[in-house]
Amino acid sequence: MFTPEELRQAKIFACLDEAECARMAQNAADVRLKAGEWLVRSGETPWFYVLFEGRLRIVADIHGIQTEFPEYDFTAGDFLGEVPLLLRTPVFNSARAQTSCRIARLDKQQFFQLIRDSKEARAMVLEVLGERLLRIQERSLSLMTSRVLIFGRNKEADCHNIRAFLSANRIP
């Protein structure tokens, strides 16, 4: 279990008042991983994670090949998980421990409470979110494109919705 003093070591929690920090410490799960263990896998329910010890690396499944991204390593003080929480989607990249790690895990409700109650925490999350969404967009554009073929009636709502999604996301 994390103490409020331990949580304050991370910038995201340092801006909280004593009562808020104590509440976060009481509710945060204390996750410990060994090198090689998975923190989260693609497709799982999102959580908000703050790394206190160790190093995590992002791993993505690209065209059926597991690809590591050393440029997306996380170290003590870094947080992750905000993108799928804010977009209300499942996790789309996996994270694996490169070394032994200690991580604070907050659920969706705790995360939204954190950014609702703390202007400073909200600003930090939004700044990092913008950077990460830009990286995601750049990486997506650099990948080989796939062609999608849809079978169905033109006027069916499901087919229309799928075509609209593909078009909006520039998928040929």
Residue spans for each PLM region:
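Cyclic-nucleotide recognition modules
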Residues: F69-L126
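Intrinsically disordered or compositionally simple regulatory linkers and C-terminal tails
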Residues: M124, V128-R139
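Local sequence-structure signature of Cys/Sec-based thiol-disulfide redox active-site neighborhoods
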Residues: L141-P172
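Short polar/acidic secondary-structure junctions
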Residues: D61-G64, L85-L86
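Short hinge/gating elements
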Residues: Q9, Q110-R116, R147-L149
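Regulatory nucleotide-sensing modules
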Residues: P4-I62
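Short, solvent-exposed alpha-helical surface patches in well-structured domains
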Residues: E20-R23, Q113, N161
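Short coil/loop residues immediately preceding or within conserved phosphate-binding loops
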Residues: L7, A28, T45-P46, E68-F69, ...
